[in-house]
Amino acid sequence: MSVLESKIHTGSEQFRENTEYHKGLLAELKERSAAARAGGSEKAVALHRSRGKLTARERIDALIDPGSAFLEFSTLAAFDMYGGEVPSAGIVTGIGMVEGIECVIVANDATVKGGTYFPMTVKKHLRAQEIAEQNRLPCIYLVDSGGAHLPSQAGVFPDRDHFGRIFFNQAQMSAKGIPQIAVVMGSCTAGGAYIPAMADETIIVKGNGTIFLAGPPLVKAATGEEVTAEELGGGDVHTRVSGVADHLAEDDAHALELARSIVRNLNRRRHTWLDIVEPVAPLYDPEEIYGVLPKDLRTPFDVREILARMLDGSEFHEFKSRYATTIVCGYGRIHGYPVGIVANNGVLFSESALKAAHFIQMTDQRRIPLLFLQNITGFIVGREYENRGIARDGAKMVMAVANAKVPKFTLVTGGSFGAGNYGMCGRAYSPRMLYMWPNSRISVMGGEQAADVLWTIRQEQMAREAAQAGRNPQEAMPGPAELEEQGRRFKEPVLAMYDREGSPYYSTARLWDDGILDPARSREALALSIAASLNGPLPPQEEGLSYGIFRM
């Protein structure tokens, strides 16, 4: 492979300014992430510990293999939602190595609203299960939850992708041979009782773990029977009498050791279908990415400068390097794993879309994972390009992305706007993981463009209203100065809305992505993501009616 040669001057004033700006964004990300990881209030955490419990993240640390990484999903889920009182949506999810086996871990945080399920909690739990199913990863549920957040019941209970879907997914995954393991470490009430009841194997902690469809207050109200939580659904009852649970643990630490023992006996081996080699560090320091990225998304830069700081040995076998240069395609490795890369380097023209479609088909047939680096304003617009068939050619790229069977991964490094989001494997195209950088923006179009479009429509509406009233539209319109002022006032709230909703924090709060990454650490997160995908089966090659690679 060719070695990418950086043309960035790391001693320049521009590089220094870029670095300072992006490190400021990173500091904000770290501050917000640390606050989310702290969980509930100090009082709630103290009460939790007084019961002999570990926190959700302490439980995960004790469960995974010593010294191994935990790839956490959506740390900032529900950020700035629900009055800021539900950090991480009250649940911690991610991929961790347990006894050498990658597992999806779902841990309720009982220090946050008693571990109850808000709408975003449900969405985050379901997303973790989706990742587990796509990648055939065992699920370990560390249960400590009061069930549905009752005031939010309309957004939690009745619909297809609400609380009940959790149990549906458990049943489906179990039927596919994807292990489901539950560790009941606290309350497990009402519908939540089905998490351990539907697991393949269940552990319950003595004294703290309880499983029941109706707690003592509801039992008393319904039947008049007075019973304690332990008598109704404690560990002794469920391991000795009902058989709902299989193992009784003395405390959290014992329960997590039992969980490790269960994983040890799953009889799972990964049979990789990729050509993996020993990893090599990039020739250029990944920390330099802060200086490579411009402060303004509208400022162009060569995406190869990012690749030089992300790929093993900064090696890159580029495809069609002289053709359709606003899209960069080629092969490289990340921590030894081969990847086919599709990276924006400007607006998408017809030629760019055709080149990408060709490369995506070829990479899919070679069964190499695809990595999309999104920094896209969209497809080119205008009469000339419409006449040349930009919609038809863009559709070819979208078709190739949608039908690629290999694992796909998306990293938004800048803008993610309009149909460009679709062509570059946005959330709707089922990438195994989708991450964003702190400088990224996502919306149907830029705020200024949206404001201009809406203001144009408003002016046309004003002219129609004048005509309908029998007035000359041109004479009825305000003078230039007044019209400009009206336009400014009209556009102001539109610009503010797009600025707020285009933020990566707005996106990650609503799980439009799987987390915001430190640009200099993205290489590690991508490697862990690719590694997890290898637990799944070999991507299929279609039987029957099939075609070779179309040269676009």
Locations of the language-model features?
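Ligand-binding clefts of soluble mixed alpha/beta catalytic domains
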Residues: 1-552
